[in-house]
Design a protein with these regions (language model features):
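Carboxylate/His-rich catalytic cores and anion/metal-binding grooves
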Residues: 124-147, 297-310
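Aromatic (Trp/Tyr) and acidic
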Residues: 28-122, 126, 156-191, 224-241, ...
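C-terminal beta-rich recognition modules with glycine/proline-rich loops and embedded aromatic residues
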Residues: 302, 368-376, 381-472, 492-516, ...
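Bacterial N-terminal signal peptides
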Residues: 8-18
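Asp-box/WD-like beta-propeller blade repeats and closely related beta-sheet repeat scaffolds
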Residues: 151-172, 198, 203-219
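Aromatic, loop-rich ligand-recognition surfaces of beta-strand-rich domains
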Residues: 220, 665-667, 702-812
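Predominantly extracellular/luminal regions of secreted and cell-surface proteins
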Residues: 664-702
């Protein structure tokens, strides 16, 4: 993309028009959120934590995401669709990889537009002009925009359906694509003043208004977000049919599946269920409609859902969506760590949702969750250099998790690129004559309060490493107004709202203190905010001190995976132990007794500068004779968001406090010391698949235990293999295979399998002494005539419409 935008700059005018012309509006919005965020363009971040990340996002993540969209044909799909509309001969009419591939350029355009708003860049501006022209050319005359159908109306992607919209409630993603288009269009218009993409969006939205609604087609989006996009178009234009359609689509949800929150009417839903990204986008859309219409049924429903999610289904990192097979919520308190999915997109969606709930209710608890997610489960989704991404964000790893530059389903990179540049818009908010301070980071901002009073505010802090924050408040003229400063729950002894997590230490910590012009004032807490109402003069200071001791966190006893374990937290940051910092490069064998003292110190040269927690822990291992041994060794924990930036290996957030909870390092076996390869070995679609999991000596709990396994998804009906190379000739006589299956996915038992050994350069079947078993929840043992060989293979025949997987494969 770096070369592409330079080429575009030559072809197009490099001058950027940073103005905001009026869009003709039918009606101005009459209602809105009672609290309004201060626009991100009014907040200039200059701290050492977020400013570098935002700059890396601008300089690295956005350009490389555009490069990936070019390389993988996502942008070419628009060119191909335009050729069809122009009646040109298109030889290649193959369907895109997925029908939602159109959204990836849209999301990166949105992020690039936010970046342009605060950092004018004529080269990037010109590149967007060229890209938007391609998108506009792919739009059909009536406004329909969906490249896979336009490229080949007779044979679109298999998920798309034979006609427009007929498969929308299941898999086509037609409306999902448009939701991201609308959000990108509004962002681009507001950043540049140009209507090029906005006109495409409005033409599309007018088609939706003409197609769906009372007396027309009834439909609910299979993957929610168009509701949020329609509300954004309503905000810009004031055209009430867009808002009405967003509400109609929400109200049409019932009689479907819980997977996409369509089993019950939205106002009757009370629990987080199904696909987590779909869910948070829907809850955000419900909040928007509630704010714009005043319908309290929506807010009542999402309030109940929030209590369920935060109280029973959220990880200590703020991540949501425990179940990988559905990328979504599991049962209450079912929060496994190694198989935790916690999709990066779900964390972004959670941030959207919690921000909207704060704007509705003005309670700091929503910002507490936003902050927890932001500093832990969200930014863990991108590497420190801005070039690689996590799709899932587990809380435990045996080395199978690695960030990837891109994915087949590439929703997460685009979501990161659009969220980070908008972060300054989450710092402050305003209601009447009250100014809310929600997030702590060094910045300068100007806020307009009720009556047009302008207040300049400056923050100076080393947060999140220090809890000392100085605010300098400078109204244009002296006057009376209210400053509301969030006091985080973690600083008030509350690990998280509700009883899902709590601090292990019951002793009182150092109190929070607040000073105005160096005079201590009472906190006067109101819904989690220290409230100071007074006559303010320019240049007055507010000093907030939030103590940051190292805290041990415990989980509700109903969370089976975390019993007898603690997580470590300091300030808003959750920590983890990572293999690199362990003397033996293992951390899952570590026990951290409650009696051990822990201290924090700043390591400026580590991971771009981080606070680390140090102490001593006990490390357990099995010796050759099978006896359990342990040693006391130095212990180091790093911020969770920074893990997997130094290579693949073990990681653990929840640390056992006694020997019974440890995973002692096993004594090596023939399989564990072998080189492991598999057929069709490529990077997993979500960056979590590694062949070495077949021989990691991790005993599965059941065949459905997804924590440590390898599968061949999305291969179906083919013959696949896994291979151990011994590095020399070995005598073997049996294998044990533990099959992995998904309860709700496409990985099932194979149709059959056999064992082959390498004889010279030829693979030969062994002479098995019994059947090749396909039993679940146990090892399938096959003994055979002993052979001497340098390598052995499992050859697996997949069922016609299914894939297969293996949790563990032993060789004797």
């Amino acid at each position: 993309m770096r070369k592409l935008i330079l080429k575009a700059a030559v072809l197009l005018s490099a001058s950027a028009a940073f103005f905001l012309p009026e869009v003709p509006a039918q009606d101005a919005p009459k209602r809105d959120y009672p609290i309004q965020p201060v626009p991100f363009t009014a907040v200039h971040v200059n701290d050492a934590f977020w400013a570098p990340r935002m700059e890396i996002n601008r300089r690295v993540s956005i350009p490389t995401a555009f490069e990936q969209c070019e390389r993988t044909g996502r942008i070419e799909n628009f060119v191909r669709a335009a050729m069809v509309l122009e009646h040109k001969d298109l030889q290649d009419k193959h369907a895109p990889g997925y029908p939602f591939d159109d959204t990836d350029p849209y999301k990166v355009i949105e992020g690039a537009s936010y970046a342009l708003s605060v950092h004018p860049d004529p080269v990037l501006d010109a590149y967007l002009d060229a890209l938007i022209a391609k998108i506009a050319a792919a739009q059909e005359p009536d406004g329909y925009l969906y490249t896979t159908r336009t490229i080949d109306p007779e044979h679109p992607h298999e998920w798309s359906g034979t006609e427009r919209w007929v498969n929308e409630e299941v898999l086509s993603h037609e409306l999902y694509n448009l939701g991201h288009l609308y959000e990108a269009a509004v962002a681009h218009y507001q950043a540049t003043g140009k209507r090029t993409l906005l006109d495409v969006a409005l033409k599309s939205a007018d088609l939706l208004v003409a197609t769906f609604g009372p007396g027309r087609k009834t439909i609910y989006p299979g993957h929610q977000i168009v509701e949020m996009g329609l509300v954004k178009l309503y905000r810009v234009t004031g055209r009430t049919p867009y808002l009405a359609l967003a509400q109609f689509m929400l109200d049409s949800r019932h009689g479907g599946r819980s997977y996409n929150q369509a089993d019950l009417p939205v106002i009757e839903q009370t629990e987080g269920e199904g696909h987590a990204v779909r869910a948070t986008y829907m809850y955000s859309g419900m909040a928007d409609v509630a704010a714009m219409t005043g319908d309290k049924n929506y807010s009542k429903a999402i309030d109940a859902i929030w209590e369920n999610v935060v109280g029973k289904k959220m990880y200590v990192t703020g991540g949501i969506g425990a179940v990988g097979a559905i990328e979504g919520f599991g049962p209450d308190y079912d929060l496994p760590n190694m198989s935790a999915y916690n999709e990066t997109c779900a964390s972004v969606g959670s941030a959207f949702w919690n921000q909207r709930l704060f704007l509705l209710h003005g309670d700091a608890k929503y910002v507490d969750i936003l902050e927890r997610t932001l500093y832990n489960g969200l930014i863990s989704g991108v590497s420190l250099d801005g070039e690689k991404y996590f799709y899932p964000n587990p809380l435990e790893s045996n080395g199978q998790h690695q960030r990837s530059p891109w994915f087949g389903v590439a929703c997460c990179p685009g979501n990161i690129t659009r969220f980070l540049p908008s972060l300054p818009g989450y710092v402050y908010a305003q209601q009447g004559d009250s100014l809310y301070v929600n997030l702590f980071l060094s910045n300068k901002a100007t806020v307009t309060l009720e009556g047009g009073r302008k207040v300049a505010i400056e923050q100076e802090t080393k947060y999140p490493w220090s809890g000392d924050i100085r605010l300098t408040v400078s109204p244009e003229t002296a006057g009376r107004f209210t400053l509301k400063v969030r006091i985080p729950g973690w600083a008030r002894g509350q690990a998280m709202p509700g009883d899902l997590y709590e601090f292990a230490e019951t002793r009182a910590s150092e109190p929070v203190s607040l000073q105005v012009d160096k005079h201590t004032v009472p906190l006067n807490l109101d819904h989690g905010y220290a409230t100071v109402t007074r006559e303010w003069k320019p240049g007055e200071t507010v000093d907030l001190h939030l103590p940051m001791p190292v805290r041990r966190v415990t989980a509700n006893a109903k969370v089976a995976a975390d019993r007898g374990r603690v997580a470590l937290q300091r300030g808003p940051i959750v920590f983890c132990a990572e293999w690199v910092d362990s003397p033996d490069q293992h951390v899952r064998n570590v026990v951290l007794p409650a009696s051990r003292t822990l201290k924090a110190d700043f390591a400026p040269s580590l991971l771009n500068g981080v606070e680390v927690i140090r102490g001593e822990a006990d490390a357990y291992r099995y010796e050759r004779n099978g006896k359990l041994a342990h040693t006391t060794e130095a212990f180091t924990a790093i911020p969770y968001y920074a893990w997997a930036n130094r290579g693949a290996g073990q990681m653990e957030v929840w640390l056992p406090t006694t020997e019974s909870g440890a995973h002692p390092t096993p004594f090596p076996t023939l399989a564990s010391q072998s080189k492991v390869t598999v057929s069709g070995q490529t990077e997993a679609a979500n960056g979590t698949r590694s062949p070495h999991m077949l021989a990691d000596q991790e005993e599965p709990g059941s065949s459905a235990d997804a924590s440590s396994q390898y599968n061949w998804w999305p291969k179906k009906g083919s013959t696949e293999w896994a291979q151990y190379d011994f590095g020399g000739e070995r005598r073997i006589s049996s294998v044990d295979v533990y099959w992995f299956v998904e309860r709700q996915g496409g990985v099932r038992l194979p149709a059959g399998w056999r064992v082959l050994y390498l004889d010279g350069a030829e693979w030969k079947p062994v002479e098995a002494g019994g059947p090749y078993g396909l039993a679940l929840d146990q090892y399938n043992h096959v003994a055979f005539q002993p052979v001497k060989t340098q390598a052995v293979r499992l050859e697996i025949t997949l069922q016609k419409d299914k894939s297969a997987g293996v949790s563990e494969w032993k060789v004797q």
